[in-house]
């Protein structure tokens, strides 16, 4: 009898603690959205979707497993952000991604990793990074989950490779059209109607200033290689160490915007 009573009490204590912890995590996520510290990722306009249990499991799985060879740099970025620094092995991967010529279309992600590998994160940034890894309310990045799901076999199919090369070579990806292309080619009917509405909304509206850097990066990389000026920018982002948190994205926008933005895009940035 006493043993059963002990088990019952332990169950209620554990259950109550789990619910309290869940409430705290969600409250912290809401605080991130309200306080405006995530303006670079525009969480306020991307909070329409909730992750399914399957997607959440994938997100947690991506942090721990090492078999996702095609997108290991994403996993490494999460790991590097959660610890505040990069290990020697992670640094080797970053250098490998830079030197080998097969990742031309995604070199901007390599630059992001490199820029973060030497920069320091503030305590607030560190809390956000850890929160993004663990919490289940990371609503605005389901498209990344879809992309990872499609590419999680460790290599690209011929069709996926063609898409990547197409995104690099053609210069017609304005706004968020490149995201739509990726989603259309990779999702295979896995997106809900609400998610599709969000994607279309991101393409048509001009209020997503925090993601315009992606457009600029694709435009700058549209020839399959970097110019000397662009290479200098990448090296500068790596060496100067002043990019705390995600400020390097802002710096990249400013550096790439000179002479590369249309009048309409310049107006959007103001």
Swiss-Prot record:
Tissues expressing the protein: Expressed by the skin dorsal glands.
The keyword tRNA-binding is annotated on this UniProt entry: no
Protein location: Secreted
Maturation-removed propeptide residues: 19-35, 52-65, 87-100, 122-135, 157-170, 192-205, 227-240, 262-270
Family, as annotated: Belongs to the maximin-S family.
Asparagine amide: modified positions: 83, 153, 188
Protein's job: Maximin-S1 has no antimicrobial activity. Has no hemolytic activity. Maximin-S2 has an activity against mycoplasma but has no activity against common Gram-positive and Gram-negative bacteria nor fungi. Has no hemolytic activity.
Natural source organism: Bombina maxima
In-chain residues carrying the UniProt-annotated modification Lysine amide: 118, 223, 258
Name of the protein: Maximins-S type D
Keyword vocabulary terms for this entry: Amidation, Antibiotic, Antimicrobial, Cleavage on pair of basic residues, Secreted, Signal
Signal peptide span: 1-18
Gene Ontology annotations for the cellular component aspect, listed alphabetically: extracellular region
GO biological process terms held by the UniProt record: defense response to bacterium
């Amino acid at each position: 009898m006493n043993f059963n009573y002990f088990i019952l009490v332990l169950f209620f204590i554990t259950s109550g603690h789990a619910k309290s912890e869940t409430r705290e995590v969600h409250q912290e996520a809401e605080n991130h959205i309200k306080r405006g510290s995530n303006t670079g990722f525009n969480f306020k306009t991307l909070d329409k979707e909730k992750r399914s249990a399957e997607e959440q499991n994938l997100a947690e799985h991506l942090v721990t497993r090492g078999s996702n060879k095609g997108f290991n740099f994403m996993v490494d970025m999460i790991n590097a952000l959660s610890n505040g620094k990069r290990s020697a092995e992670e640094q080797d991967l970053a250098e490998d991604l830079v030197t080998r010529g097969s990742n031309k279309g995604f070199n901007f992600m390599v630059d992001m990793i490199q820029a973060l590998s030497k920069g320091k994160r503030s305590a607030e940034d560190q809390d956000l990074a850890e929160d993004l890894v663990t919490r289940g309310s990371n609503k605005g990045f389901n498209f990344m989950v879809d992309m990872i799901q499609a590419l999680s076999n460790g290599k690209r199919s011929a069709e996926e490779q063609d898409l990547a090369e197409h995104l690099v070579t053609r210069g017609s990806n304005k706004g968020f059209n490149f995201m739509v292309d990726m989603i259309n080619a990779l999702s295979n009917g896995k997106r809900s109607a609400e998610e599709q509405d969000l994607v279309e909304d991101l393409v048509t509206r001009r209020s997503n200033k925090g993601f315009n850097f992606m457009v600029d990066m694709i435009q700058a990389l549209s020839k399959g290689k970097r110019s000397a000026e662009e290479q200098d920018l990448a090296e500068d982002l790596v060496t100067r160490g002043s990019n705390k948190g995600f400020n390097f994205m802002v710096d990249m926008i400013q550096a790439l915007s000179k002479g590369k933005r249309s009048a309409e895009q310049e107006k959007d940035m103001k």
